[in-house]
Amino acid sequence: MTDSSVGIGCETALMLARNGYYTYAGTKNLSQARDLSHISKEEKLPLRIIKLNINSTFSVGFAVKKILKEQQNKIDLLVNNMGYVLLGCFEDVSINEMRDQFETNFYGTVRTVRSVLPFMRKHKSGKIINVSSIAGRIGFPVSSAFVSSQFAIEGLSESMRIELEPFGIHVSIIEPGMVRATNFMHSMVIANKAKKPSSPYSNITRKLTKNIEQMIGMGISPREVAYTVLKAAKSDYPLPRYIVGDDAAMIMENRKSMTDTEFDKFVKNTILNV
């Protein structure tokens, strides 16, 4: 499990361990996983916290090698957590900021999957669960970099699902809407240019950021996402996609039933209140 120190990652690691999975909870910063460590020790869970920086090929390789050594060269389940959200209209996002967004959200997933895949293929079994977002299916304003990274995860997952099926490996995507978590805003980064009042997009950026803060309070619990991951992990035939949350389900239903023009208007009314 990647990015396990807080929020969805923490709840998912605990959910899996509480249901009998020997869980390796990866985190870039071990000091941020103190709560997870405390709960795990208190409940005597089969969970180990390991240092894992998904932006480093060496770190991912080292962590996977360690796990394989302890688990007789077998990994049954890989859960890739979402990463972070870069806010800012496209023109306000620099090339380097866009690249950093993809480096974590997309290439981080690529690194972990490439590291475990040969061993899953050898055993002709395994599950890969990528926690994405409803933003991987729909474009939203002021988040073009994040949305693009999630679309990339969706495309990668769909392609891998077909490629890996002959080897007994299942690939699923978890698509939550807004998640109610105290750390959620900390997982958001505003592009440098988007912070400036001189930006031609400053009004829309400010409005969206304010609305997101309000919507988070009405979002689903991270535990609900964790339960969905567990459901996919336990299934002999997991679904390609799991939409999590009433807001996500409602958005997808509207996307199917509306024209592009109608849906654009719906997004502006819902997200921007215009």
Model-derived features with residue positions:
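Conserved glycine-rich Rossmann-like NAD(P)H-binding loop of the short-chain dehydrogenase/reductase
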Residues: 19-35
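The beta1-alpha1 cofactor-binding region of Rossmann-like NAD(H)/NADP(H)-dependent oxidoreductases
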Residues: 52-62, 95
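Residue(s) in the substrate-gating loop at a strand-loop-helix junction
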Residues: 133
